[in-house]
Regions:
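N-terminal auxiliary "cap/dimerization" subdomain that precedes the catalytic jelly-roll/cupin core
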Residues: 1-94, 285-292
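Elongated scaffolding segments in large macromolecular assemblies
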Residues: 19-20, 28-48, 212-220, 224, ...
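Short, solvent-exposed loop/turn segments at secondary-structure junctions
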Residues: 32-33, 114, 147-148, 161-162, ...
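Short, cationic low-complexity segments
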Residues: 54, 161-179, 261-281
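Conserved double-stranded beta-helix
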Residues: 88-162
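Generic recognition of flexible, low-complexity loop/linker segments
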Residues: 129, 207-209, 227-231
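Double-stranded beta-helix
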Residues: 151-221
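Non-heme Fe(II)/2-oxoglutarate
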Residues: 225-293
């Protein structure tokens, strides 16, 4: 059963176990989460020089939007303050900083009504993160920078929890993605030509769920959940933040969520850094985790 829990009184070990069972965790805005959102808003305002960045797509050509959004996303990811703010969030959430690792945080920019659906504004089709070579032990943290409405959020498909769906993950290799796919994001025009892993059969939307969150409200879910960018018909660009965490203890024990239909190659584990000092995951842990993805 895919339960939704709001601000649960759980230890971090208990929280991870619930997420590995397919549950969703919602966190109310806290000072560290609000600080991360404020940091992102400052960068967004600087990039677009606009009092209302959510509607800027209506005032500039898409080529200019790409030229502004691409560097913005890179600055957010690589800014040392971004990583420090993520660490503050993990401290408040009860994570052990010596055994918790997180990957580079990302600022997502999802425009409205087909203005930009590729490259830096890619609207993700239904997928599991494990299809992109993520480990079963990965947990996803997702929060909007501005308040959302139903036509501006994510779609979750909990009916596929532990149930396979035909997909093209066997054609995905993470090393190739790093070499070609990610670096070519700003070169994508109206059609995204990168090799994304996708369903090869129709997704049953009978159990679709959408979380309509306020700014800094945060959704936690397993990397094994099937999810997608909901079609944005709001007239407003959606800005959101996501990052992923793993516990070294889970990699060692083999703990994680079901992974019923993943055939991707490679591993994202080398992207993760330790929360305490931002050092990379040791190679022996990468090898151990990769064998279990």
């Amino acid at each position: 059963m895919n339960l939704v829990r709001l601000n649960p009184a759980l230890t971090n070990d208990e929280l991870r176990a619930k997420l590995f069972d397919g549950e969703f965790i919602l966190l109310s805005p806290t000072k560290p989460l609000q600080a991360l959102v404020a940091h992102a808003r400052g960068m967004i305002s600087g990039a677009f020089s606009d009092q209302d960045p959510c509607s800027v797509q209506h005032r500039i050509p898409v080529e200019e939007f790409i030229q502004r959004a691409g560097p913005l996303k890179s600055r957010f990811t690589n800014d040392p303050k971004t990583k420090e703010l993520i660490r503050d969030i993990l401290v408040e959430s009860g994570c052990d900083l010596n055994s918790t690792y997180f990957d580079v945080p990302r600022l997502r920019v999802v425009s409205s009504d087909g203005y930009l659906v590729s490259g830096v504004g890619y609207a993700y089709k239904a997928h599991r993160d494990t299809w992109y070579s993520s480990p079963r032990a990965q947990l996803n943290w997702w929060l909007p920078v501005f308040d959302l409405i139903p036509s501006q959020t994510m779609s979750m498909y909990p009916g596929y929890w532990n149930n396979p769906i035909g997909n093209s993950s066997a054609d995905f290799d993470y090393d190739e993605w790093i070499r070609v796919g990610r670096t070519n994001a700003t070169k994508q025009g109206s059609v995204d030509t990168r090799k994304h892993p996708l369903p090869v059969e129709k997704v049953d939307s009978a159990t679709e769920m959408r979380f309509v969150l306020k700014a800094a409200e945060t959704l936690l879910f397993s990397a094994s959940h099937l999810h997608a960018t909901a079609p944005n018909s709001s007239g407003q660009t959606r800005f959101s933040i996501d990052f992923r965490t793993i516990s070294l203890d889970d990699l060692k024990s083999g703990a994680g969520a079901p992974d019923p239909d993943n055939a991707s190659q490679g591993t994202t584990l080398r992207d993760f850094i330790r929360a305490s000092d931002f050092q990379p995951l040791p190679e022996d842990a990468v090898a151990m985790g990769a064998r279990r993805t």
